[in-house]
């Protein structure tokens, strides 16, 4: 029996094991997110963008026929594609983090667990 409201040694050891496991898996997840290529495209598919699971821009593809569009339409399509890629990437990252932590509410910066 632990005194002074402290957990017993077994519970403490188990908590440290779990923390170490999460830390190791977090590094694997970081590597996985870094190597992901997530696509976002405009509704008319004139513009496609790819970003990593860490939301870093990777590349852009523009159809030849985009030259027939006006400036405002091109800008709208670029923004649309970026937003879709970012949303998918962010959702993927949150899901993977949730899987990693087993649904623990860790309140990690940038990952509002209440968004899901």
UniProtKB/Swiss-Prot annotation:
Bias (Basic and acidic residues) ranges: 89-98
Location of the region described as Disordered in the Swiss-Prot/TrEMBL record: 89-116
> Where is coiled-coil annotated?
none
Stretches of Low complexity bias are at 99-116
Mostly located where? Answer: cytoplasm
Question: What GO CC terms are in its UniProt record?
Answer: bacterial nucleoid; cytosol
Output the InterPro entries linked to this UniProt entry: YbaB-like_sf, YbaB/EbfC
Which keywords are on file for this protein?
Answer: Cytoplasm, DNA-binding
Molecular function terms from GO: DNA binding
Record has Cytoplasm as a keyword: yes
Location comes to: Cytoplasm, Nucleoid
User: Could you confirm whether the keyword Zinc appears in this record?
Assistant: no
Quaternary structure (record): Homodimer.
Recorded hits in PANTHER family, A to Z, give: NUCLEOID-ASSOCIATED PROTEIN YBAB
Family, similarity comment: Belongs to the YbaB/EbfC family.
Function in brief: Binds to DNA and alters its conformation. May be involved in regulation of gene expression, nucleoid organization and DNA protection.
* Identification of the protein by name: Nucleoid-associated protein P9515_00191
Annotated source species: Prochlorococcus marinus (strain MIT 9515)
């Amino acid at each position: 029996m632990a005194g002074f409201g402290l957990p017993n040694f077994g519970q403490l050891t188990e908590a440290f094991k779990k923390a170490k496991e999460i830390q190791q898996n977090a590094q694997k997840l970081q590597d996985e997110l870094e190597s992901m290529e997530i696509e976002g495209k405009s509704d008319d598919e004139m513009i496609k963008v790819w970003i990593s699971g860490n939301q870093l821009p990777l590349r852009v593809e523009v159809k030849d026929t985009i030259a027939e569009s006006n400036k405002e339409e091109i800008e709208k399509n670029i923004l649309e594609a970026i937003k879709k890629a970012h949303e998918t990437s962010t959702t993927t990252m949150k899901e993977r983090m949730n899987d990693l932590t087993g649904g623990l509410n860790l309140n990690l910066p940038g990952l509002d667990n209440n968004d899901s």
